[in-house]
Structure formats: C-alpha cells, structure tokens
Amino acid sequence: MAPKDDTVAVTGLTHQERQAVEMLYRAFSEGNPDLLDEAVTEDWQDIPLNPGQQPGREGMKPLIRGFLAAFPDTKIEILEIIGTPGRAAVRAVMTGTHSGEWFGIAPTGRSFRVAIHEFHRIADGKLTHTWHLEDWFGWMNQIGARPVLVEESAG
C-alpha cells in the first residue's frame, strides 16, 4: 500500500525516487508483480535472495506470485522513508492471513503482522539494489509454527 503524504514521513528523496520505492511495495499489496518493471532495474539485486529465487527483476515475479498464493490479503504499509540522493531506508509493516503453504508450513488461517526494514540503492529513478530484513521468526510465532529449539528436542 503506497503511503499517504499526510501520514508517512518521507525525507531526502526526489519524487521519482519515492515513486520507485513505493511501487516495489505496491507490487505485493496490489498483487501485481509487473509493477516491478516500473520500480526496479532489470538486473536489480535483491539481497539476500530467498530460497529458490532467481536473480534480477524477473526472478522476483514468481516469488511475488507464490507469496500472494500463501497470503492473498497481503498489505504492506510504509511507515517511514528516509533518503539521501540515490539511497532510501524503509520502515514498513506487512499484514495478512496465512492461507497457503509458505516456508514449508501448511496454511494456518491465522493473521499476522510483520516488521520490514529495507535499504535501497536508486539510480535513474529505479531501484538497483535492495537489502531486506523481515521478521519471519515473529511470523512463525504469530501463526503458531514456532520452531523447536535444539534444547527442547534433546530433552
């Protein structure tokens, strides 16, 4: 979900840079992987790659489709964008319902809220690099799929 100008702090970015950043998150929230064509370069680097993800813009599109199959009501709300020319940091929250398999975990029907922190490099109005960190451990706890710790399994 693109942020509303009156609710999100955005600093240091040109209008074109801000649009590219917002478009990346809209691809997920609107269920439209083709929005990546407007947001990221063809050789965009998503760091780290997710399991099974191929590099580049085209490598992310199947991941978005799989993500939307697992979480069809996904919404990403951008809370803050902090930028300098050519760089942006994003603090966001992702919400949804676990309706399909993800990370090998069968659907639970439980809703979740996950923090997202990402850093982007931008050139010529498109993202060239994204370093991302999502709270997947918190997601597992929220859906009731807490991993078994080594100490628990040994006892």
Segments from the language model and where they lie:
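C-terminal and inter-domain tail/linker signature
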Residues: 1-155
